[in-house]
UniProtKB/Swiss-Prot annotation:
Biological process terms in GO annotation: rRNA base methylation; tRNA methylation
Keyword Magnesium: no
Gene: rlmN
Name of protein: Dual-specificity RNA methyltransferase RlmN
Species for this entry: Helicobacter pylori (strain ATCC 700392 / 26695) (Campylobacter pylori)
Positions annotated as active site in the UniProt record: 89 (proton acceptor), 345 (s-methylcysteine intermediate)
Function comment: Specifically methylates position 2 of adenine 2503 in 23S rRNA and position 2 of adenine 37 in tRNAs. m2A2503 modification seems to play a crucial role in the proofreading step occurring at the peptidyl transferase center and thus would serve to optimize ribosomal fidelity.
Amino acid sequence: MKASIYDFTLKELSQLLKPSFRAKQLYLWLYAKYKTSFKDMQNNFSKDFIAYLEREFALRTIEITHVRESVDGSKKYLFKSLRDNHTFEAVLLKMKDKKIDAETNAILEREKYTVCVSCQIGCQVGCSFCFTQKGGFVRNLKASEIIQQALLIKEDNNLPLEKALNIVFMGMGEPLNNLDEVCKAIEIFNTGMQISPKRITISTSGVADKIPILAGKNLGVQLAISLHAVDDKTRSSLMPLNKKYNIECVLNEVRKWPLEQRKRVMFEYLLIKDLNDSLDCAKKLLKLLNGIKSKVNLILFNPHEGSKFERPSLENARMFADFLNSKGLLCTIRESKALDIEAACGQLREKKLSQQI
C-alpha cells in the first residue's frame, strides 16, 4: 500500500514537493478543509500534480467503523486499519470550561474537547488493571494513524479548524514504546492541525530510560506518569514494568524533566478499593513526591469484564485528595467520563469487527 500523505511532516513535504510552497498548500487542504480525495484539491493544483499525488500517496488509511455515544456526550470510536484490518479505539471527551471575562468579570462557559488517542494496537506493558492488555500486543501505530484519529473525530463532529483540541496519549499503548511515531504525530498536530504542544499530554507507565530521550526532543508537551502505588511490591503487582523500572528509578528521571514556569508533572494514581486507597498511602505518596513540582490526578478504578479489582467509594477518594491538598500537594479527582460505554481510563482494547463496542 502507498505511503499515507499524513505520515509526512511539513518539512518533509517541502523537501519532497517542487516547488516547495506546494507543501503548505497541501497541508491546508489536508488539515483545514478535511479533503478526502486529491481530486477535491484541483482549485490549487494542476491535473498533472493531482495525478502525481494519486500515484505516490494514499489519503485515508483508517476508517471509522462504529461510534458509541455516552449519556455525558462523550464518544468512543472504533477505527479499522485499511492496511491490515486491525482495529483500535479512541475517545472524544466533552467537558465544560469556565473562564472569567476580563472586562465584565462574567463567567463564560464553553465546551472543551479532548481526544484520547491510541498509539499502539494492544500494549506490551501488561498492567493488571487495564483492559487493553487482555488483547495482547499487535503492532505500533504509524504517525498517520494517530493523526487520523483526531482528524476523523474532528470531522465527524463538524468542529471547525479554529476549535482547539486537547490531545492526550492515554488510549491504547505505551507512547514511549513507539516514540518516533508519537513525536512525528506531535509535530504534525502542531503544524497541521494547529494544536499547541501545551495542549498535548503524553502519559507513560514509566519507561524510565526513554523519558530523557523525550525530554531531549524539546517538544513542549505535558508529561504524565502512571504511578498507581506508593511501594514497589504493590506497583509491581499492578504494573510488571516496575520490576525493570522501579518507583525511584522513574522519579529520578522525572526530577530532570524540563518544566516551564508554573508547570507541573502530572502523576496519575488509580485508586483501587482496599489496595492503595488508604490515608496511609496518601501520606506515603506525599513523601514520595516531595521536592518534585507535581500534581496528582486520582482516578477511581473503572470496572471491566474479568477484572478482580473493585472501585473505591467517592468518599474515600475525597479523603485521599483532601489530605494531599491540605499538605500543599495539588490533587484532583478525575471525572469518569464515558463509563457507560466502556470508554473510560483503562477500558479500551482491540475489537474484532464482529464485536459491538
